Amino acid sequence: MNWAAAVCWALLLAATFLCDGSAAKGGRGGARGSARGGRGAARVRVRPAPRYAGSSMRVAAGAAAGAAAGAAAGLAAGSSWRRAAGPAELGPEDAEDGAPGSNGTGRGVYSYWAWTSGTGPTGHRHLCPLLGGALGALRLLRP
């Protein structure tokens, strides 16, 4: 996993931690059973502990831990793993077009980018700063 993905997961974990309300109610909402207003009952509101308190936090923490483990594994492996070829790069399978018995179509004929736009693929490296800036502008990253 590359660093951009690890940073995105860390941002997701931070946003979940800061936006997860401690008063968030889990389970079924509303009054249940005799708490709806039985006869002679005192009107005292007792709030039990939420059923699923912090479940989103546990999921986000697990996702961030997985992202960190993936980034660490990627660093440990280093150059021993073969990196997948991107849309603008040639891989070992791309030499099949010139092989005898092939239909001779070029690489760009069946490409998604060739059919949808006249430009090449663009990098999405600005997604994490954009996400952080948007969350900051919406004031969602405050405690």
Swiss-Prot record:
Natural source organism: Bos taurus (Bovine)
Cellular compartments annotated: Cell membrane
Entry function: Prion-like protein that has PrP(C)-like neuroprotective activity. May act as a modulator for the biological actions of normal and abnormal PrP.
Family membership noted in the UniProt record: Belongs to the SPRN family.
Keywords linked to the UniProt accession: Amyloid, Cell membrane, Glycoprotein, GPI-anchor, Lipoprotein, Membrane, Prion, Signal
Residues spanning the signal sequence: 1-24
Lipidation (GPI-anchor amidated serine): S117
Membrane topology: Lipid-anchor; GPI-anchor
Main location: membrane
Sections of the chain in a coiled coil: none
InterPro entries noted in UniProt: Shadoo (IPR029238)
Keyword Cell inner membrane appears in the UniProt entry: no
One Gene Ontology biological process: protein import into nucleus
Propeptide intervals in chain numbering: 118-143
Pfam families for the chain: Shadoo (PF14999)
Protein name, UniProt field: Shadow of prion protein
GO molecular function, one term: nucleic acid binding
Family matches, as PANTHER family: SHADOW OF PRION PROTEIN
